[in-house]
Structures are given as C-alpha cells and as structure tokens.
C-alpha cells in the first residue's frame, strides 16, 4: 500500500515524454525476434531532467522501463530566469547541439528531441541548433551533455576566487 502511494506521488512529480519508439529485430535460428526500444525524457519543468532507454517485447513495457531508467538518471539544469546562463555545445557521438540563451518571451526554438529535453527541464526561452547526427538518442545525449556544461556566474566566481561583480 505504501509502495503504491509512493508511485502515485512520483508520477505526479515528473512529466514524461516518449521521444522515440524503435522496432528492433534479432535474427535467430527459428526466424526473427521482435522487440521494441523506447527513448523517454522525464522532467519536473523546474530544473531537473533525465532520459532513459528501455527494451521489451511490448511497447508499454519498454516505455515503463525507459521511465524507470530516466528517473535514475536525473541532472539539475542551472537557469537564469527562464533561460540558460550562457552558450554551450553538447557533443555525443556524431551529434552536436548548440544551445544559446534567448530573451524572455522568445520561447523554445528547438526541434524534436531537443525540445522535449529543454521543455521538461523548465527552460522557457532558448535557441538551439542541431549539427551532425540527427539520431534521437545521440541528440538527447548531446543536449544533456550541453546542459551539464552550464554553470551559474556564482559557481564560476567561486572557482576563480573572485566576486560576481568582477565579471560585469
């Protein structure tokens, strides 16, 4: 009973979005084995976001596994108001994602998988450009890499042993 209540609370805390579902086959002696691979992004629209992949013989089971994996793989995104603190270039494999802060009210200028990650992270104003590979998993991983590179002015000042006013 307590386990069930915890799951209900967890479900309301995070929003999830299925980025892609891929049918994969394995050729065996007796023919082909079909399975489904799901890529899911979860976030609380308040600075926390994660992604996960799941594989199963049925689509709902693959999605459930991907959601579980995503909740174990959360990162915190530093934000300045509704946008990012500075530019970042995320790279994973052949995929590169350029993330740029935008003025308030500009919205999320991003496509597909990048939009899912940024919206669920709670970033409301950002411009992005996808370069290289457009495979959904590479794009999501590159976006998360770019978000991991972000630092607030206070963090940079502390690392350099200066005050924030020295940078202005």
Curated annotation (Swiss-Prot):
Residue ranges occupied by any S5 DRBM domain in the UniProt entry: 14-77
Record GO biological process: translation
Keywords: Ribonucleoprotein, Ribosomal protein, RNA-binding, rRNA-binding
GO-annotated cellular components: small ribosomal subunit
GO MF term (any one): structural constituent of ribosome
InterPro entries xrefs: Ribosomal_Su5_D2-typ_SF (IPR020568), Ribosomal_uS5 (IPR000851), Ribosomal_uS5_bac-type (IPR005712), Ribosomal_uS5_C (IPR005324), Ribosomal_uS5_N (IPR013810), Ribosomal_uS5_N_CS (IPR018192), Ribsml_uS5_D2-typ_fold_subgr (IPR014721)
PROSITE patterns: RIBOSOMAL_S5 (PS00585), S5_DSRBD (PS50881)
Keyword Nuclease carried by entry: no
Disulfide bonds: none
Comment block on domains: The N-terminal domain interacts with the head of the 30S subunit; the C-terminal domain interacts with the body and contacts protein S4. The interaction surface between S4 and S5 is involved in control of translational fidelity.
Family per record: Belongs to the universal ribosomal protein uS5 family.
Function noted in UniProt: With S4 and S12 plays an important role in translational accuracy.
Subunit structure: Part of the 30S ribosomal subunit. Contacts proteins S4 and S8.
Protein name per its UniProtKB record: Small ribosomal subunit protein uS5
Gene that specifies this protein: rpsE
């Amino acid at each position: 009973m307590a386990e069930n209540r915890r799951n209900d609370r967890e479900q309301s805390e995070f929003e999830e979005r299925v980025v892609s579902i891929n049918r994969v086959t394995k050729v065996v002696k007796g023919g082909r084995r079909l399975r489904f691979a799901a890529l899911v992004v979860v976030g609380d629209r308040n600075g926390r976001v994660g992604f996960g992949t799941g594989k199963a013989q049925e689509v709902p089971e693959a999605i459930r596994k991907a959601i579980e994996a995503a909740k174990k793989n959360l990162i915190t995104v530093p934000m300045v108001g509704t946008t990012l603190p500075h530019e970042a270039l995320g790279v994973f494999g052949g995929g590169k994602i350029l993330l740029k802060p935008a003025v308030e009210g500009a919205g999320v200028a991003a496509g597909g998988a990048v939009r899912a990650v940024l919206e669920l992270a709670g970033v409301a104003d950002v411009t992005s450009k996808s370069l290289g590979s457009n495979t959904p998993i590479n794009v999501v991983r590159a976006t998360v890499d770019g978000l991991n590179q972000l630092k607030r002015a206070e963090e940079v000042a502390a690392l350099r042993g200066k005050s924030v006013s020295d940078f202005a």
